[in-house]
Amino acid sequence: MREDFKVNDLENAFKKATKIVSETARTKIVEKTDSFIHAEAKTKWRRYTDDLLLKAIPEKGIIQVRSESRVGIGDNGVNQKRVDDFAYRLMTE
């Protein structure tokens, strides 16, 4: 699942995105630069590890968010929900 989020102030939005990811339950940042975050998110059920990737793209003024399962074919909507929850927090907090 991948979505792009247009933001007005990319630098501050990416700082906010970093805070959101670091505060998300069962999620740990494993790599971070000024424009990229790779986090591992554990699912509630069975504790599978999923990848959560965020990338700031200055040329487009967007934060690209991708959540994907490492194991299995279906995810019961977990990755979509993770991206939706992130988007809600990014736009409302």
Regions found by a protein language model. Name each.
Residues M1-E93:
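Ser/Thr-rich, low-complexity intrinsically disordered terminal regions
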